[in-house]
Amino acid sequence: MHINEFAGLLIPSGTPYDPRFNESDGAMTMAKWQRAAAAAVIALAAISTAVASHAAAEAASGPAGKPVNKPTGAPIQLALIEGMSGPFANAGAAVERNLRFGVEQVNAQGGVKLADGTHPFELVVLDSKGSTEEALVQLRAAADRHIGYIMQGNSSAVAAALIGAIDKQNSREPGNRELFLNYSADDPALTNADCSFWHFRFDAHAGMRMDALGDVIQRDKSVKKVYLLNQDYSFGHDVSSLARSTLATKRPDITVVGDEFHAIGRVKDFAPYIAKIRASGADAVITGNWGNDLTLLVKAAREQGLDTKFYTFYGNSLGAPAALGDAGVKHVIAVADWHPNAGGAPSDAWYAAFRARFPQAQDDYPVLRMPLMIETLAAAMNRAGSADPTAVAKALEGIKFDNGFHASWMRAEDHQLIQPLYVMEMDKAGTPGVKFDNEGSGYGFRTVLALPAERTVPPTVCRMKRP
């Protein structure tokens, strides 16, 4: 697996966004943040212009340095099919913000350059209500509107259903084809045994994430017993099996003392699960939980005083740090393609621009791969000189994209994006390596392991059928 005015920002006291926060402690005052954000927008514009110019040159477009004009062609619609209501509405809203940010960045740079002129992107949001059946209904609605680009990611089960339907759609109606852009559905099968020419994944799959977590667990000798707790659907089962195989390879001395699944989106009180974890004597929990299933889990752990480490896929997001508070300090580890404290001026500038666009504390969940997906799509269209899904799919294969601080490339063999990964540890904002906090909580994450893209390349068994 979740606005525009600083004057409207609700600022929790004692956080880096609090005007009273001591700047000497290493965090940012509000005045300093506003100045930095304004400067960062200018810096990000320069970075984006350079990237856009490079992509345009690659596609034999107009000369670099020419003033950017507003795109005048018909909008190219991108359909987001996601749960915008229901138990994971917060995750859906976070996705929409990140994708909208990417769309706005592309449009601000003149849109995409096709043979008939420049075209803006337009984000069309379709609510799947967290249901596979409703997602398929919305997919049909998108096809009826001849929307050629489908984006989804907050469920691997939904993603698999959409890919199957798109495969059939594209075979039956070659004049109305659709391309599926996946930003978070992390079931490894989607770029392995079940790979499809019409599917591109822009997130590291569960195996890639678990391998990175495994590198950190390997050197954490305090961990002797591990409890596996995951959501009861394809992704959760993948996390469980991958955790077992990774531990067997990297830490065969660790004992798995529990391996449990719970209904996705239905558990309101995780106290019984916390009691089981405590009784097992586990030193650490490995979980792929996301959204409210993660927030409620870590909240229960805090309330029950559970003193174990949480090795998570998404522990840095959507309310989890605030729910844990001090109990999470040096106890919660997460893995992601990027995080605000990754460091470096270009990274800081991008983050400041995102916060300037979405300054509310609860909106502080930037997911770099989502805007990056939009920008990479634009670069592929520029390369193809077309918005036809088939031509764009071919242009996406092997494409390299560098926004100035996060270089990535799309492997043609299985349509898996290869990019850096970061493993991070929760701590208080203002401590070394934690310049920024998450969602105004006063807690953020520091990098404990940074893997360059070449260290994250997974094997694949994909045997793709091409049109």
Model segments located where?
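Extracellular/periplasmic Venus flytrap/periplasmic-binding protein
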Residues: 134-137, 146, 188-189, 196-305, ...
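Periplasmic-binding protein-like
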Residues: 142-156, 173-183, 227-230, 281-291, ...
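Extracellular/periplasmic periplasmic-binding protein-like sensory domains
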Residues: 196, 298-372, 381-387, 437-466
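Beta-alpha junction/loop-to-helix N-cap segments that form part of ligand/metal-binding clefts
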Residues: 63-67, 90-97, 112-192, 202, ...
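Extracytoplasmic "Venus flytrap"
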Residues: 62-102, 127-132, 155, 229-238, ...
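Short, low-complexity disordered leader/linker segments with a strong preference
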Residues: 1-77, 144, 465-467
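Solvent-exposed, acidic/polar segments of extracytosolic/periplasmic ligand-binding ectodomains
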Residues: 58-65, 76, 400, 404-467
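Signal peptide-proximal N-terminal region
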Residues: 68-73, 97-123, 248-253
